[in-house]
């Protein structure tokens, strides 16, 4: 609903950046607080966003989901 209106009612009290969704502000606030709630179970790494943890886990699993467009290497 707010996607195309430009409305951003959620403002960061630290840097005044504005967001369309409250959960985007919540995630952004972790940059200011240093909170990293997502922990790797294989090493000491911690992450602000779960998507970053999922991407990091590929280091441990050896998963290489993207192939080179030129030689098909992964």
From Swiss-Prot:
It holds the Pfam family zf-C2H2. GO terms for cellular component: nucleus. InterPro entries: Znf_C2H2_sf (IPR036236), Znf_C2H2_type (IPR013087). GO terms for biological process: segmentation. One of its GO terms (molecular function) is DNA binding. It is found in: Nucleus. A zinc finger (C2H2-type) spans 1-4, 10-32, 38-60, 66-74. Its main location: nucleus. Keywords: Developmental protein, DNA-binding, Gap protein, Metal-binding, Nucleus, Repeat, Zinc, Zinc-finger. SMART domains: ZnF_C2H2 (SM00355). PANTHER family: MYONEURIN, ZINC FINGER PROTEIN. Krueppel is a gap class segmentation protein. Belongs to the krueppel C2H2-type zinc-finger protein family. This is Protein krueppel. It comes from Psychoda cinerea (Psychod fly). The gene is Kr.
């Amino acid at each position: 609903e707010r996607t195309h209106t430009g409305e951003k009612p959620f403002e960061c009290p630290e840097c005044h950046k504005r967001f369309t969704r409250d959960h985007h502000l919540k995630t952004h606030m972790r940059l200011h607080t240093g909170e990293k709630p997502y922990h790797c179970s294989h090493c000491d790494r911690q992450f602000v966003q779960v998507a970053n943890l999922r991407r990091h886990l590929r280091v441990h699993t050896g998963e290489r989901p993207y192939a080179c467009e030129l030689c098909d290497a992964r």
